[in-house]
């Protein structure tokens, strides 16, 4: 071996596993719980309302799964599903990302709105879907929520919204932030007309969504373990220079500090909503007592 070879650095290469090898769980067939790491058959998990059979973790639901689990069979009618986002600010790559999400989710936007019955009681229902642009709120999401509220007001039925969002959609800038005021104003008018508002916050409900319509219900509920907050935990800790409680920004923390009315298990959600709708319907108090 020459002197030159002794002092020369040997090249080291990192081995990158193939896509097939890197998959711990077969896609679509099995699902791993992000909390306890238990691997479950996806179809069994879906039957259990996507609640982990081992630790009770509430896994993410898409809008269709949520509606199917809540609304009486054959009663849901979607409206304004044709509305789609454009690119008002000319944000690079935004149209391509929207199109990719449309293909992946079969949705036009991050929310589905419609009307249906829960335990025989009519309501207008809005369900956000975090699989589309992380459920972010752009101008179309705000418009669909506002139109749904106005529909509930015109029909004199309750308005129920399930939130799941990373906050305002940055690609739409100020137009996205305007939806906070727009949706809040619509809820205010609906409330002044004696309309019933039920908000259910699911994981995650953050940013501008948590700071606007998500927190404006007559009843504010959440699912167990849901992340709910405005700014991120790290940002808050760096700002106040203090450590935050372990359960900070969880549904249970908010309930303990009076910011929620209840934390409701997914398996009990339909029955709970049905009882509240019955209570607020004509003769509802008598019906509630009889049940």
Swiss-Prot record:
The keyword Isomerase does not apply. InterPro entries: AcCoA_carboxyl_beta (IPR034733), Acetyl_CoA_COase_Trfase_b_su (IPR000438), ClpP/crotonase-like_dom_sf (IPR029045), COA_CT_N (IPR011762), Znf-ACC (IPR041010). Keywords: ATP-binding, Cytoplasm, Fatty acid biosynthesis, Fatty acid metabolism, Lipid biosynthesis, Lipid metabolism, Metal-binding, Nucleotide-binding, Transferase, Zinc, Zinc-finger. Its EC number is 2.1.3.15. It is found in: Cytoplasm. Pfam families: Carboxyl_trans, Zn_ribbon_ACC. It is an enzyme of class 2 (transferase). Gene3D superfamilies: 2-enoyl-CoA Hydratase, Chain A, domain 1 (3.90.226.10). HAMAP family: AcetylCoA_CT_beta (MF_01395). Acetyl-CoA carboxylase is a heterohexamer composed of biotin carboxyl carrier protein (AccB), biotin carboxylase (AccC) and two subunits each of ACCase subunit alpha (AccA) and ACCase subunit beta (AccD). This is Acetyl-coenzyme A carboxylase carboxyl transferase subunit beta. It comes from Bacillus pumilus (strain SAFR-032).
């Amino acid at each position: 071996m020459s002197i030159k070879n002794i002092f020369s650095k040997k090249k080291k290469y990192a081995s990158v596993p193939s896509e097939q090898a890197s998959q711990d769980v077969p896609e679509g067939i099995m699902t791993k719980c992000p909390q306890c790491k238990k691997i479950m058959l996806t179809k069994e998990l879906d039957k259990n309302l996507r609640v982990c059979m081992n630790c009770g973790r509430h896994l993410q639901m898409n809008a269709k799964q949520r509606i199917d689990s809540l609304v009486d069979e054959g009663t849901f009618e979607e409206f304004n599903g044709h509305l789609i986002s454009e690119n008002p600010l000319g944000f690079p790559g935004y149209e391509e990302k929207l199109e990719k999400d449309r293909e992946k989710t079969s949705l036009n936007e991050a929310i589905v709105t419609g009307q249906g019955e829960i335990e025989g009681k009519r309501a207008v229902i809005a369900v956000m879907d975090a699989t589309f642009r992380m459920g972010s709120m752009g101008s179309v999401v705000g418009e669909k929520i506002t139109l749904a509220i106005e529909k509930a007001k015109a029909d004199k039925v309750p308005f129920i919204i399930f939130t799941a969002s990373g906050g305002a959609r940055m690609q739409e800038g100020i137009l996205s932030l305007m939806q906070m005021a727009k949706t809040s104003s619509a809820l205010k008018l609906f409330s002044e007309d004696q309309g019933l508002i039920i908000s259910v916050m699911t994981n995650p409900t953050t940013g501008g969504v948590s700071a606007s319509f998500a927190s404006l219900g007559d009843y504010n509920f959440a699912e167990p373990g849901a992340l709910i907050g405005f700014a991120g935990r790290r940002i808050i800790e760096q700002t106040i220079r203090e450590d935050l409680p372990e359960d900070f920004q969880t549904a249970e923390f908010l309930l303990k500090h009076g910011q929620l009315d209840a934390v409701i298990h997914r398996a009990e959600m339909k029955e709970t909503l049905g009882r509240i709708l019955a209570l607020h319907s004509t003769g509802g108090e008598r019906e509630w007592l009889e049940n």
